[in-house]
Amino acid sequence: MITLGSVREYISSLGVAEDEHVYMGTLDVKQEKSLGVYNSKHQYSSHRALGGPDLEGYGEKYVTILVHWDKSPRDTEMVAVGLYETLRRARDILTEEGTIKFFQLLYDPQDIGKDDTGICEWVIEAAVIFEKKREGE
């Protein structure tokens, strides 16, 4: 099973933002040039193998990545699109909890406007497809 923590660690390893500016589950301080990784609040259908859980080869974890960057719409869009392209190409990422096979990006990065202080924000929605370990592996 891949957790939000593993996804956060991978996003941090990309070097888009400083490690201390990559948050998981909450973005309390809202510093400029930060990324937030959240469990998606959207509902998606559940997928199960016909033969039961022992035959499942992969799992899905739905996440939302918030790009909270600076007051420049252009700079913020560039960061969001760059991160999107990096995730689109990512394959077979080893984490402490298992292997992320790939990111299934659900749509292009979305501009969600500015926060209370005028910082531009974009979101990326993705399904993290990960390899499930079978019993005894």
Predicted regions and their residues:
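A short glycine/small-residue-enriched secondary-structure motif
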Residues: 55-61, 100-103
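Short, solvent-exposed beta-strand/turn "edge" segments of beta-rich domains on protein surfaces
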Residues: 52-57, 115-117
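Oligomerization/assembly interface segments of phage tail-like spikes and tubes
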Residues: 57-71, 120-131
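Acidic-leaning, charged glycine-interspersed low-complexity segments
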Residues: 88-132
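Small/polar-rich, solvent-exposed N-terminal microdomains that initiate assembly or binding
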Residues: 1-53, 90, 137
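Mid-chain, well-packed structural core segment of small domains
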Residues: 68-92
